[in-house]
């Protein structure tokens, strides 16, 4: 029962919530912690439970003092003092499971305890909070639904108005019905005439199309025939050309012309060959002159290069002398720096040795600390294992207790069923007893009536 689905409040918080949610006026002001601690007051709990039932179910105060109608009671005056408690327990028995409390009993009303009552009241307060949030959401949903219903109503009204307008537009008034009929007849006649004209025109066009198609096919045939005739004529022309022979005079003139052209071509070829020989001789003379000129140019260029090299070597020698002087001064500086660095290195080595000694010492201290921590962790782990074993044992005990409680509840249910059966048997026995008493009373009455009648007869028969 410790893993519940609602928070457990302390007594101060319960008093504040009850003043704000359940009790109002003087009852809420008079409520205090002393009403719940050390022992809760039953009359205060009756008032709180009744107010919660009034808030949730709308149960009135007079309902708690009324006999239930669905139960037959032989002696109702005996139950008058116990009616409020029984009705309160009857309503709370159905209300507490809704608040996630499943172990509420009548002893919690008659002889309340502080821990159980605080749990019951915290469950009731949690349910009231949940109910208020649900009511707020439901009210928002109702407002949205109302606005949507109003919009739907407006849209339906607008739709109906539009339908009415459409009906008015579609419907023809009585005054214009005759004109509408005449116009309708005229339109039908015009449609009929137009259809006839369209059919006639379509038939004429189809006939023309068939004629054009036939003419086109004839023309294509004629064109194909002409093409065949042209091809045949070309073949005849080629055959005739091969058979034609030129005249001898034309052949002679043509040969003379060809000879003249050949002589002209030969003379032109000879001139070209002569010019080629002259050009080749001139080209052969050119390379020797060019070689001499190139040699002179190379020598002059080598002299210029040598001059430039000499000037550059002189400059380099001067630069090297300056560099040698600067390097000698730098060497002196470097020697002094080297001596200072050697001194620094010795100092740093000494410092490193001291630091290494300190580091080794710290490492040893850390190792020792780790060993102690591991030992402590092992001890804690052992304690944790022991606690886990205790927790498992406690959980097993709780499980056993829960199973025992369940068994007790089952036994209680069985005893309740047995008591109900006994009550039914007692009721039936009482009814039989009452029936026997009624029968005996009736028999006694009949006997007494008979005896009184006999006595009366005897009295009347006796002489005076």
UniProtKB/Swiss-Prot annotation:
Annotated coiled-coil positions are 148-201, 249-372, 413-443
Keywords, ordered alphabetically: Acetylation, Cell cycle, Cell division, Centromere, Chromosome, Coiled coil, Kinetochore, Mitosis, Nucleus, Phosphoprotein
S-S bonds: none
Q: Which GO terms describe its molecular function?
A: microtubule binding; protein-containing complex binding
* Span list, region Interaction with the N-terminus of NDC80: 1-385
| Residues carrying Phosphoserine | 171, 247
Identify the stretch(es) annotated as Interaction with the C-terminus of NDC80 and the SPBC24-SPBC25 subcomplex: 386-464
Cell division as a keyword of this entry, yes or no, is yes
Q: Which Pfam families match?
A: Nuf2
User: Could you state one GO cellular component term attached to this entry?
Assistant: Ndc80 complex
Q: Does the keyword Coiled coil apply?
A: yes
Q: What are the subcellular locations of this protein?
A: Nucleus; Chromosome, Centromere, Kinetochore
Q: How is it modified after translation?
A: Can be phosphorylated by AURKA and AURKB.
- Indicate where the modification N-acetylmethionine is found in the sequence: 1
Please name the GO terms of the biological process aspect recorded for this protein, alphabetically. attachment of mitotic spindle microtubules to kinetochore; attachment of spindle microtubules to kinetochore; cell division; kinetochore organization; meiotic chromosome segregation; mitotic spindle organization
The record's section on InterPro entries has: Kinetochore_Nuf2_N, Nuf2_N_sf
Purpose = Acts as a component of the essential kinetochore-associated NDC80 complex, which is required for chromosome segregation and spindle checkpoint activity. Required for kinetochore integrity and the organization of stable microtubule binding sites in the outer plate of the kinetochore. The NDC80 complex synergistically enhances the affinity of the SKA1 complex for microtubules and may allow the NDC80 complex to track depolymerizing microtubules.
Would you identify the family this protein belongs to, as annotated? Answer: Belongs to the NUF2 family.
| Subunit and partners | Component of the NDC80 complex, which consists of NDC80/HEC1, CDCA1, SPBC24 and SPBC25. The NDC80 complex is formed by two subcomplexes composed of NDC80/HEC1-CDCA1 and SPBC24-SPBC25. Each subcomplex is formed by parallel interactions through the coiled-coil domains of individual subunits. Formation of a tetrameric complex is mediated by interactions between the C-terminal regions of both subunits of the NDC80/HEC1-CDCA1 subcomplex and the N-terminal regions of both subunits of the SPBC24-SPBC25 complex.
Q: Return the protein name.
A: Kinetochore protein Nuf2
What does the record give as the organism's lineage?
A: Eukaryota, Metazoa, Chordata, Craniata, Vertebrata
Q: Gene of origin?
A: Nuf2
């Amino acid at each position: 029962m410790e893993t519940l689905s609602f928070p457990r409040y302390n007594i101060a918080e319960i008093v504040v919530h009850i003043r704000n949610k359940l009790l109002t006026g003087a009852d809420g002001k008079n409520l205090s912690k002393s009403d719940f601690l050390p022992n809760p007051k039953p009359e205060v709990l009756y008032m709180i439970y009744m107010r919660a039932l009034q808030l949730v179910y709308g149960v009135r105060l007079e309902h708690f003092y009324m006999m239930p109608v669905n139960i037959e009671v032989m002696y109702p005056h005996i139950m008058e003092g116990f009616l409020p408690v029984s009705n309160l327990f009857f309503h709370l028995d159905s209300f507490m499971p809704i608040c996630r409390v499943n172990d509420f009993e009548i002893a919690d009303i008659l002889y309340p305890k502080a821990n159980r009552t605080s749990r019951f009241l915290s469950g009731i307060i949690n349910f009231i909070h949940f109910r208020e949030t649900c009511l707020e959401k439901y009210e928002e949903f109702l407002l949205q639904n109302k606005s949507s219903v109003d919009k739907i109503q407006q849209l339906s009204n607008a739709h109906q108005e539009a339908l009415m307008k459409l009906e008015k537009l579609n419907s023809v008034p009585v005054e214009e019905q005759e004109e509408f009929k005449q116009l309708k007849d005229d339109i039908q006649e015009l449609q009929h005439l137009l259809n006839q004209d369209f059919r006639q025109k379509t038939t004429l066009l189809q006939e023309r199309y068939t004629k054009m198609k036939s003419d086109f096919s004839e023309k294509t045939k004629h064109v194909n025939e002409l093409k065949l005739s042209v091809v045949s004529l070309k073949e005849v022309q080629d055959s005739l050309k091969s058979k034609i022979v030129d005249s001898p005079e034309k052949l002679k003139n043509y040969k003379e012309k060809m000879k003249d052209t050949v002589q002209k071509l030969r003379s032109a070829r000879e001139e070209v060959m002569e010019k080629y020989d002259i050009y080749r001789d001139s080209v052969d003379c050119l390379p020797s002159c060019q070689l001499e000129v190139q040699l002179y140019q190379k020598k002059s260029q080598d002299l210029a290069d040598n001059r430039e090299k000499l000037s550059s070597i002189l400059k380099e020698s001067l630069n090297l002398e300056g560099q040698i002087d600067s390097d000698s001064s730098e060497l002196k500086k470097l020697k002094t720096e080297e001596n200072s660095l050697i001194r620094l290195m010795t100092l740093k080595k000494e410092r490193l040795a001291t630091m290494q000694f300190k580091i080794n010492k710290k490492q040893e201290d850390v190792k020792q600390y780790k060993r102690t921590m591991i030992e402590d962790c092992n001890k804690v782990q052992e304690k944790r294992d022991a606690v886990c074993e205790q927790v498992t044992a406690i959980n097993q005990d709780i499980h056993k207790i829960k199973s025992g409680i369940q068994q007790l509840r089952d036994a209680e249910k069985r005893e309740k069923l047995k008591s109900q059966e006994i009550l039914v048997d007692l009721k039936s026995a009482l009814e039989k007893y009452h029936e026997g008493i009624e029968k005996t009373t009736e028999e006694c009455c009949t006997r007494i009536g008979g005896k009184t009648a006999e006595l009366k007869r005897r009295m009347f028969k006796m002489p005076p």
